[in-house]
Amino acid sequence: MIHPETNLDVADNSGARRVQCIKVLGGSKRKTASVGDVIVVSVKEAIPRGKVKKGDVHQAVIVRTSYPVRRADGSAIRFDKNAAVLLNKQQEPIGTRIFGPVVRELRARKFMKIISLAPEVL
């Protein structure tokens, strides 16, 4: 459950380390986002010589949440921290590597590039 002003870790090598959600996309009344949802983020912390810099505004897809994700079989999966992958205008990842596991729900949302780059899909 990601709300506006929630801080997230970045799970790729785009150069950003921490981002803050500034808008949940998908309708004017939408207040929260979960795994697989696209949000608008502002880069709060970045490494030198990265592809993005502090203050940049990008779209991102949520790949891990600390709030449990319920599945159809009754199981739930949760992570220690919230994490996102930054996207460009064509909804493709900015980075070329993904760090840490991602959830299977991304496959249904057509984020195949992220699924293929991830070291583990849970």
UniProtKB/Swiss-Prot annotation:
Family matches, as InterPro entries: Ribosomal_uL14 (IPR000218), Ribosomal_uL14_bac-type (IPR005745), Ribosomal_uL14_CS (IPR019972), Ribosomal_uL14_sf (IPR036853)
Pfam family, one: Ribosomal_L14
Keyword line: Ribonucleoprotein, Ribosomal protein, RNA-binding, rRNA-binding
Record-stated family: Belongs to the universal ribosomal protein uL14 family.
Subunit description: Part of the 50S ribosomal subunit. Forms a cluster with proteins L3 and L19. In the 70S ribosome, L14 and L19 interact and together make contacts with the 16S rRNA in bridges B5 and B8.
Function: Binds to 23S rRNA. Forms part of two intersubunit bridges in the 70S ribosome.
UniProt entry tagged with the keyword Ribosomal protein: yes
Identification of the protein by name: Large ribosomal subunit protein uL14
Alphabetical list of PROSITE patterns matching this protein: RIBOSOMAL_L14 (PS00049)
An example Gene Ontology molecular-function term: structural constituent of ribosome
Cellular component, GO, one term: cytosolic large ribosomal subunit
One Gene Ontology term from the biological process aspect of the record: translation
